[in-house]
């Protein structure tokens, strides 16, 4: 007898080996119809897989996260089925599940077009309507090779070569189409009805730009239509908020092909940059950091000492002068150690906190570049704290408080916290790691926040805290970090005089709150949909005259506002006032002031707030107080 224990601890007995689907059928026909797969003793298996021993079983349905992932993976296979029917000479490569969807990489003689994508989606729906079973066959390695060789699937053969130890592999048959996968997959195409192909892109075999280019078809799949509709709505909203689109519409920045991955900031974009940088400079000042500035080009000997030259050189921009090799710095840490060791330091000097708006360069692949979010040249709010082991806890508590204030001021209210602990390969004693891990976790506990632990994900030189933001669309952005480092200061000869007149290497805490300013500004643009709060807005108020007779008064209003340190745009163009109001409203300005004869004579302004709110007439003094208060309150 085979005894199956279900999640509620009830048991069912069967006279012999039994499939997951048969167990589901014994429970009820409704569950059987919903069965996507099973989890046997914690391992996912196909619904057709047979259980031949006493086991715990969970039936997986589309309502389970695992079920949804299986549906997405099977929909990727369905893409392959449709593509091979429509384009028989196409070579299928790989089709994994990604967050909220899937993609399939395909080798074909020409790029796919939007019309091709529509045809593929239509064929997929025709295949789903046939309601066919997906058949799994565990197949000996030699036979797998013959199957793909006979079909001319060169990439599948290369993938088989990558798995020399696999003597049998799962082949999944969609009618005449066959694909290779560890599985599990859905038992029938009826589970695949709620899907949509979303976009086309280029890709490279094995993600290497030196290899052949492939076509990538992206898609999404869900358990029900409501979920799909919500997803499409989120994507459409994300497209409206795309920082690349808004950056152009609001005249903030552009990226030119002469400088891929490096940003050209326009006047309004640079005003936004300055608002962020000056705010962060104030944070440095208020929390005991000394602002420093290091060189951008450093000799290769330094990078050899840090290990970057040996392990990171492909990601660095290098140059040569007078028979010496140099690199543009990809990070600021070594420079801060050199500043630290430029003088004899005492334990009384610790903790010593340096902060820099350090410009870094990394040679990112061109295919990975994305607007100002993923660039080659970027500036970080990079800070390093040199301290003793006993000071780690207090510094982490103080840093977390800083970070929470900064994120709240920028409009982010939800933060996720993660602690990455010691990996197998590491420097430092277990006692030192115990102390450091306790310090970073206790710092978060004292901050009153929940956190998750990611075992083994710390760097070899110390544990770290990762701070992840959620934006207005619920997307997650890993921004802040607090990285404990037992290694770099020692490696570069940084030391201080101890209380007993000995010498010791300081612990180095790497910290960034916004990280890359370029990326953070991209996040701000998308989070606020371009309608930045008044304190950040590149132009906080526009002053418009109705006719030429109020030009001088409008100019004096603008001057008064500028004298208060406000960012003002004066528009004296000879255009209809309705046109001028619309023009500046589309720029998402916090305020528009209109002045006509009535306002001029009263020394007043007619105020319109963002969102087409007519606040009526008020004295210029009252408006100045209002806007200055908005800025002070970070509104």
Curated annotation (Swiss-Prot):
UniProt-listed NCBIfam families: thrS
Cofactor, free-text remark: Binds 1 zinc ion per subunit.
Chain residue ranges for the region called Catalytic: 242-533
Protein origin, superkingdom: Bacteria
Function: Catalyzes the attachment of threonine to tRNA(Thr) in a two-step reaction: L-threonine is first activated by ATP to form Thr-AMP and then transferred to the acceptor end of tRNA(Thr). Also edits incorrectly charged L-seryl-tRNA(Thr).
Entry binding sites for Zn(2+): 333, 384, 510
Catalytic function, reaction form: tRNA(Thr) + L-threonine + ATP = L-threonyl-tRNA(Thr) + AMP + diphosphate + H(+)
Name assigned to this protein: Threonine--tRNA ligase
InterPro entries reported for this sequence: aa-tRNA-synt_IIb, aa-tRNA-synth_II, aa-tRNA-synth_II/BPL/LPL, Anticodon-bd, Anticodon-bd_dom_sf, Beta-grasp_dom_sf, TGS, TGS-like
Localization terms from the record: Cytoplasm
Gene Ontology biological-process annotations: threonyl-tRNA aminoacylation
Organism annotation: Variovorax paradoxus (strain S110)
A Pfam family this chain is assigned to: tRNA-synt_2b
Main location: cytoplasm
SMART domains: tRNA_SAD (SM00863)
Keywords: Aminoacyl-tRNA synthetase, ATP-binding, Cytoplasm, Ligase, Metal-binding, Nucleotide-binding, Protein biosynthesis, RNA-binding, tRNA-binding, Zinc
Keyword Repressor: no
EC number per UniProt: 6.1.1.3
Cofactor dependency: Zn(2+)
Family: Belongs to the class-II aminoacyl-tRNA synthetase family.
Subunit structure: Homodimer.
């Amino acid at each position: 007898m085979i005894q199956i224990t279900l999640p509620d601890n009830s048991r069912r007995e069967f006279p012999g080996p039994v499939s997951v689907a048969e167990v589901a059928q014994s429970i009820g026909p409704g569950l059987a119809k919903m069965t996507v797969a099973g989890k046997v003793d914690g391992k996912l298996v196909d619904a057709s897989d047979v259980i031949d021993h006493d086991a715990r079983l969970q039936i997986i349905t589309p309502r389970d996260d695992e079920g949804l992932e299986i549906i997405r993976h099977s929909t990727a296979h369905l893409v392959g089925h449709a593509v091979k029917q429509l384009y028989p000479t196409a070579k299928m490569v790989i089709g994994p599940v990604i967050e909220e969807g899937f993609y399939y990489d395909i080798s074909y003689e020409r790029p796919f077009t939007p019309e091709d994508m529509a045809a593929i989606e239509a064929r997929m729906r025709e295949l789903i309507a046939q309601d066919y079973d997906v058949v799994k066959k565990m197949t000996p390695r030699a036979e797998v090779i013959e199957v793909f060789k006979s079909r001319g699937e060169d990439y599948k053969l290369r993938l088989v070569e990558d798995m020399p130890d696999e003597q049998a592999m799962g082949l999944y048959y969609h009618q005449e189409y066959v694909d290779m996968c560890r599985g599990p997959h859905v038992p029938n195409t009826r589970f695949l009805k709620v899907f949509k192909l979303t976009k086309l892109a280029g890709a490279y075999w094995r993600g290497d730009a030196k290899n052949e280019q492939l076509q990538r078809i992206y898609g999404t799949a869900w358990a029900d239509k409501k979920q799909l509709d919500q997803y499409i709505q989120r994507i459409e909203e994300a497209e409206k908020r795309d920082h690349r689109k808004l950056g152009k519409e609001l005249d903030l920045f552009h990226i030119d092909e002469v400088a891929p991955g490096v940003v050209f900031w326009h006047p309004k974009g640079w005003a936004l940059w300055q608002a962020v940088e000056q705010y962060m400079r104030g944070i440095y000042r208020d929390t005991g950091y000394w602002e420093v500035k290091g060189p951008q080009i450093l000799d290769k000997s330094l990078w050899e000492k840090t290990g970057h030259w040996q392990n990171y050189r492909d990601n660095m921009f290098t140059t040569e002068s007078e028979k010496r090799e140099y690199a543009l710095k990809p990070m600021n840490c070594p420079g801060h150690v050199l500043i630290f060791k430029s003088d004899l330091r005492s334990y009384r000097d610790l903790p010593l906190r340096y902060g820099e708006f350090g410009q870094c360069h990394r040679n990112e692949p061109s295919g990975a570049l994305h607007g100002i979010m993923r660039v080659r040249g970027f500036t970080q709010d990079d800070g390093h704290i040199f301290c003793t082991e006993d000071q780690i806890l207090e510094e982490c508590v103080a840093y977390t408080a800083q970070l929470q204030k900064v994120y709240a001021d920028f409009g982010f209210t939800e933060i996720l916290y993660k602690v990455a602990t010691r990996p197998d390969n590491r420097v430092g004693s277990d006692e030192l790691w115990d102390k450091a891990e306790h310090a970073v976790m206790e710092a978060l506990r004292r901050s009153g926040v929940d956190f998750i632990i990611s075992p083994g994900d710390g760097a070899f030189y110390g544990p770290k805290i990762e701070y992840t933001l959620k934006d207005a669309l619920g997307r997650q952005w890993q921004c802040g970090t607090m990285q404990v480092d037992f290694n770099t200061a020692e490696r570069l000869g940084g030391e201080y005089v101890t209380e007993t007149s000995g010498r010791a290497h300081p612990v180095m805490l790497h910290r960034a709150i916004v990280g890359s300013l370029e990326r953070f500004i991209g996040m701000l643009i998308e989070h606020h949909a371009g309608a930045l709060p008044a304190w950040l807005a590149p132009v906080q108020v526009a002053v418009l005259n109705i006719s030429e007779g109020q030009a001088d008064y409008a100019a004096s209003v603008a001057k008064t506002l500028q004298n208060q340190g406000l960012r003002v745009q004066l528009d004296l163009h000879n255009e209809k006032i309705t046109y001028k109001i619309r023009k500046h409203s589309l720029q998402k300005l916090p305020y528009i002031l209109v002045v006509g004869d009535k306002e001029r004579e009263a020394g007043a302004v007619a105020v319109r707030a963002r969102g087409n709110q007519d606040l009526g007439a008020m004295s210029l003094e009252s408006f100045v107080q209002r806007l200055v208060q908005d800025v002070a309150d970070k509104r």
